[in-house]
From Swiss-Prot:
It comes from the Bacteria. Belongs to the UPF0262 family. The lineage of its organism: Bacteria, Pseudomonadati, Pseudomonadota, Alphaproteobacteria, Rhodobacterales. It holds the Pfam family UPF0262. It comes from Cereibacter sphaeroides (strain KD131 / KCTC 12085). This is UPF0262 protein RSKD131_1985.
Length: 158
């Protein structure tokens, strides 16, 4: 079964995440574990590793690290992605999320809806960038990419 069965966020930031960021993280992990599609392609003439997988996301030396293990915790892969392609979309996503959280407190539903539509658009762009960067390393569907992008944002800013 090619899916993620466990996810861990290796967060080494000395600053604890805000309540909103922690909530986003918990929801993304719950949704991701409920439904996801994650497969590793065949590489270097070897058959692809079979899931379910345990995934640890981390930032090390300025790179996004995917540490992938079997359900029995045997290492089946690790790859590193440059954070460069994510920087602007992560920054935009956090700015729009801040606006959204503030809007929910004081604006009418029509204005909240407009901000939420913009937030979803930026989130979709982040998922697209992630799918593109994962090409040849891991195969994910768009919903899995969206949830992983949320976790990357939390890791990046949390």
């Amino acid at each position: 079964m090619n899916r993620i069965c466990h996810i861990e966020i290796d967060q080494t930031s000395p600053i604890p995440p805000t309540a909103e960021i922690e909530q986003e993280r918990q929801v993304a992990i719950f949704d991701l574990l409920e439904e996801n599609s994650f497969a590793l392609p065949a590489r270097e003439g070897r058959a692809p590793a079979e899931g379910p997988f345990r995934l640890t996301l981390a930032i090390r030396e300025g790179r996004l690290v995917f540490d992938i293990r079997s359900e029995e915790e045997e290492k089946v892969g690790e790859f590193h992605l440059s954070l460069g392609p994510f920087r602007q979309v992560v920054k935009d996503y956090f700015h729009i999320c801040e606006s959204y959280f503030e809007a929910v407190k004081r604006l009418p539903p029509s204005q909240i809806e407009a901000i939420d539509m913009a937030r979803r658009g930026i989130h979709n762009e982040g998922a697209r960038v992630l799918k593109e960067r994962l090409e040849g390393k891991a195969e994910v569907d768009i919903d899995t990419a969206r949830r992983l992008f949320t976790l990357i944002c939390v890791l990046h800013w949390g």
